[in-house]
Amino acid sequence: MRIDVISLFPEFIAQCAAFGVVGRAQERGLLELQGWNPRDHAQGNYRRVDDRPFGGGPGMVMLIEPLRACLEAAKAADARPAPVIYLSPQGRPLTQPLARELAQLPRMVLLCGRYEGVDERFLDQAVDMEISIGDYVLSGGELGAAVLVDVVTRLQDGVLNDAESAAQDSFEGPQGLLDCPHYSHPSSHAWGDVPEVLRSGNHGAIARWRRQQSLGRTWLRRPELLDEATLDKQDRRLLEEFRRELAPGDEK
């Protein structure tokens, strides 16, 4: 996959992508990440990329022409078609199903806004989709772009050392439930013991426990996800057992 990022601070994206899963994906040739700065395509001695908004008001607005020229250069760098995605608090919420859709693309261009935003005419003419990473406002789109890069990169074949890691994540699978708890060594600690079932070697019992914990944790923390999940009789039985086994002080 190739991802081009248009940003006034492309080095920020490069630094975020230099480590962990995304860095490893680049080393393996599974991800090509390229930053583009609109200031490099601005005119005049000051290479201005923003100006005051019509109608007055605070802040500055990113100008059409530097962005248009920058986008043209980014698109020309690779012949494959690429949707242009603007990171915006007004966009479609980024979810795991949407991430899976985007991960199937061979290429995408991410646009990071700054100041009060981007001239609406550029958004109308050049942007295919707006995506939000949450109902809050950041100083710019770079953090959102870094999140999106990470989310879609880890879904690429060969990026994770164990493909099952992604399949068992929260929000994955047809039900989109939260993940179950995980434990490692030591088995006994002052802060608690590892559940006995995980040390039993009984794979059927372990699978049942993990499924029940996934259902129960979703019910406790994100109950609205269960409204959209299709649970069979076994799932409903496991969830009911989980509810009954809760200590009185832990009940919702």
Curated annotation (Swiss-Prot):
Predominant localisation class: cytoplasm
Official protein name in the record: tRNA (guanine-N(1)-)-methyltransferase
Transmembrane regions listed in the UniProt entry: none
Subcellular location: Cytoplasm
Oligomer and partners: Homodimer.
Listed InterPro entries: Alpha/beta_knot_MTases, tRNA_m1G_MeTrfase_C_sf, tRNA_m1G_MeTrfase_TrmD, tRNA_m1G_MTases_N, tRNA_MeTrfase_TRMD/TRM10
Organism: Xanthomonas campestris pv. campestris (strain B100)
Residues annotated as binding S-adenosyl-L-methionine: G113, I133, G134, D135, Y136, V137, L138
Record flagged with keyword tRNA processing: yes
GO terms for cellular component: cytosol
MF GO annotations: tRNA (guanine(37)-N1)-methyltransferase activity
Superkingdom classification of source: Bacteria
Role played: Specifically methylates guanosine-37 in various tRNAs.
Catalytic activity: guanosine(37) in tRNA + S-adenosyl-L-methionine = N(1)-methylguanosine(37) in tRNA + S-adenosyl-L-homocysteine + H(+)
EC code: 2.1.1.228
One Pfam family it belongs to: tRNA_m1G_MT
Gene name tied to this protein: trmD
Protein's GO biological process: tRNA N1-guanine methylation
Keywords in alphabetical order: Cytoplasm, Methyltransferase, S-adenosyl-L-methionine, Transferase, tRNA processing
Family, similarity comment: Belongs to the RNA methyltransferase TrmD family.
